[in-house]
Amino acid sequence: NTINVITLGCSKNVYDSEILMGQLKANQMDVKHETSDDANIVVVNTCGFIDNAKEESVNTILEQIERKEEGKIDKLFVTGCLSERYKPDLEKEMPNVDEFFGTKDLPNLLKSLGADYKHELVGERLTTTPSHYAYLKISEACDRKCSFCAIPLMRGGHKSTSIEDLVTESEKLASKGVKELILIAQDLTYYGLDLYKERRLSELMTKLSEVEGIEWIRIHYAFP
């Protein structure tokens, strides 16, 4: 089997797809990113944040359903924010999708793809960005209850990744030639409050700046 992962939405989804593909590669599986030529299994990683993104996600799923009906692919799986937020509706409207998964269902998605979730793979990813830079997701989700934002509904409460694991991941990226880290999260300035009971973004950046080979660090998604 060859698995094609299609990524829609923001850089955090790109990161999630890279983690998925890293797990698949560690399971000795043939995985592609956004190519439809020779893959017989497709995973669509969706966005559900704004109307345009929802429309793009739905249209992409429908395109892949059509390809499945034409016999061009054997199986179709959908994951990500749209699937997390609207799973019952999507299952009803799109019965030709083999299975829908939410934002925290990676082990179950891997199982359906015939792979095992490997807990020991700290920082192992199949990067899709140009070789000189990579995204580094330092935390997941958000505790703020802003009336205009659905992220807590789709991603849950804020959860930081430890400084040690992020340094390990950065060292692995640097060993592959990455020179620039782009730090991403729902809210970078919240980093560390759950793990360390205080904000630790500055300490994290100091540690990352000490990683040999990393020359630039950029921060995205700060609040306010």
What residues fall within each predicted segment?
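Conserved radical SAM core fold
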Residues: D187-Y191, E215-W216, P224
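Periplasmic OmpA-like peptidoglycan-binding domain that tethers envelope proteins to the cell wall
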Residues: D194-L195
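Alpha-helix-loop-beta-strand connector modules within alpha/beta enzyme cores
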Residues: E198-W216
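Proteins enriched for Cys/Gly/acidic motifs involved in redox and nucleic-acid/cofactor modification
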Residues: N1-Y191
